[in-house]
Amino acid sequence: VLLRLAPDAISRLGAALGDGVTIVSATNGKTTTAGMIAAVLAAEGRRPVHNRAGSNMTWGVATALLEQHGSEGLFEVDEAWLPKVAAELDPALIVLGNLFRDQLDRYGEIEVLADQWANLVEARAGRTRFVLNADDPLIADLGRDTSQHRREGVLYFGIDDPSQALPELQHAFDAKHCRRCGHPYSYERAFVGHLGHYSCANCGAARPSPDVAATRIELHGMDGTEATVRLPGGEIRLSLPLPGLYNVYNALAALAAGLELGVAPERAAAALGDVRAAFGRVETIDVGGTPVAILLIKNPAGANEVLRTLRMEAGGDGLDVWIALNDRIADGRDVSWIWDADFELLAADVRRVLCAGTRAPEMALRLKYAGWPTERIEVEPDIGRSLDQAVAAAPGRLFALPTYTALLELRKLLSSRGLAKEFWE
């Protein structure tokens, strides 16, 4: 309603943020990364206006500006809405985490978004500083000019630990060709999807050396992660209470943003050591005495990282899993992405799985072809009934893997039972 009555509301309200605006965007991890940056700023006593509820299109940004007061802004922004929001808020810093194939029926291929982002970076060069993922060729390339020199005001982050490389490239490999010349990239190693160490044999474009890099990473499954992080001024140790390499990337982005925002690395690392997961981003909630670990899945790359994390938890009689696959507009109507996610990773490690959501039968079929024992696969489309059945049957922890709108349904359900807040904080 606000934007219909006052289309310039974001720019007008944003003008009050005299201490600057930071924008975070990515296909995967923007909510978590923005939350991490908020925690880093809070360690300095700074409380930015922040759309922490996860509503990341123009109306979510406008609502945060209308309801909160402060002199500094921190906003996660949907990938497609980034150019418009950036034009209205004139950010001092933009953090770009990754681009993965996601909601093809809404956005088209990721190269379209990469082109839009390239135009944004070109237009804002010299006015905005950028924190970019060196390991994503689509993102890293934004930080170079036409002569392949690093643009002024660019800080790169990435992973420099070969021990964490995948044994082979995944199906979810979205950036195969050089944006400069179209030649296929050569990968020395890949960490998450197409994130890794790459180069183009034709034109010489290659992964830039990151300014903020994780050099020694120890993954402890759901118990969290430890890493040594190399910074321009030395090394620090990071203990993160969140699992997976994807959260290492999120933390590196937050540390790099902290540097740009004037927060001492040691203080930023300490803040990240106490960070809480956003709802559905590796949060555990007690449901009827059963711990339910909720891990959002919405595209092949993100799902693969969740599956890698769960494989570290496997043992004994196997894992109890609840997967809710929806095909509503916010999920994307096209659910063919499930065939590119490596569900085969857990085929030998599952005790029981219950498929829910509007496309539950398709999910069950995908698991069958992934080699999950059919006698362990059940289908109940209703979110509430299926969750209750899965909880009742689980002897221990239940792993809940919902897509985006299924996560919203789950959040509403748990909130109605007094088990979770309706909006994450």
Task: Place the predicted regions along the sequence by residue.
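Acidic, Mg2+-coordinating active-site environments of NTP-dependent enzymes
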Residues: 19, 100-290
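Short loop/turn motifs at secondary-structure junctions
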Residues: 69, 90, 126, 150, ...
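ATP-dependent carboxylate-amine ligase
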Residues: 175, 182, 192-207, 256-264, ...
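Buried hydrophobic packing segments
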Residues: 37, 41, 61-65, 251-261, ...
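Short glycine-/acidic-enriched loop or helix-start segments at secondary-structure transitions
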Residues: 34, 60, 84-85, 105-106, ...
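Phosphate-binding loop of NTP-binding sites
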Residues: 2-158, 162-176
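General small-molecule cofactor/ligand-binding pocket signal
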Residues: 49, 155, 239, 293, ...
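Short, surface-exposed acidic/glycine-rich loop or hinge patches that mediate macromolecular interfaces
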Residues: 27, 55-56, 232, 243-245, ...
